[in-house]
Amino acid sequence: MLKIIGVRFKSVGKIYYFNPKDYDVKMGDKVIVETARGVECGEVALVDRKIDETRFTNPVKGIIRLATPNDMKTIEKNRQKEKDAFKICEQKIAAHKLKMNLIDVECTFDNNKLLFYFTAESRVDFRELVKDLAAVFRTRIELRQIGVRDEAKMLGGLGICGQPFCCSRFLGEFQPVSIKMAKEQGLSLNPTKISGTCGRLMCCLKYEQDSYEDLLKHTPKVGAIVKTADGRGVVEEVNLLTGKLRVKMDKNDNVVVVKKDDIEVIKDSVIRLDRDEIKALKGLEGK
């Protein structure tokens, strides 16, 4: 078994694994490590973990050292450089009349690369912009176009629940969220009700989906033909949490409320999005 630690390079970023070697590493410590982008400084987010080495396709790199006072000074200088680079890049974008919005700038610890994150509605030819930035900063320049979900994660904000965005508070990685989840959970398919500030489906739709899927396995769906104590009918409404169904009776069109355990399913239905729903919700899925 290999002893590892987990390191984050952003406050709510993905966790990467490293070998602590002989260092006494604690939660929250700053460590210097080598990554695909070069030498970086990250914060320890996991400690005292042991994992089978065969789970890793590549050898686990060891940390270079615990961050020193001089390393922390370097980080402060890099933060200031990022602020200056942001202002200069905005000026260059305006000068080139490019239709793009600068979101964030990141300077690698070894000062070997500047990364500029931006959003744009379409593809942008930024080759001349890269040349200008390289001439100013004399280092490698990388421009990276991000989606609206990543933009929300970087900028932060408050959701309709009044809480800080999940993505900028604790979600290390985005999970796929689909309109089918909202449909299965019986939520209103009004886009303003189920989409976040980013304009995509709210990440929290994913949190209870497993529980709803388990309930759906044992509950008739809307449109199912069932047999009740009063006769046959069609399920018009389902409350998965209470286990109660509204059933329209065949014999007199009356609607009765029954418990799912008190009926017999003759023919079940499936949950489908109709054409109008698909059209209205187009664009809510994706990045």
Model-identified regions with their sequence ranges:
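Basic/aromatic-rich interaction segments and small domains that mediate binding to polyanionic partners
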Residues: N239-K260
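Acidic-enriched and Gly/Ser
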Residues: M1-P191
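Short beta-strands and strand-coil junctions in structured, solvent-facing domains, enriched
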Residues: K14-I15, R123-D125, V235, K244, ...
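Conserved glycine-centered short motifs in functionally critical loops
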Residues: G159-T228, E236
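Short coil-to-beta-strand transition motifs
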Residues: T35-E40, A224-R232
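Short, conserved beta-turn/loop elements at beta-strand boundaries and strand-helix junctions
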Residues: D48-D52, V238-G243
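Intrinsically disordered, low-complexity linker and terminal regions at domain boundaries
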Residues: V257-K287
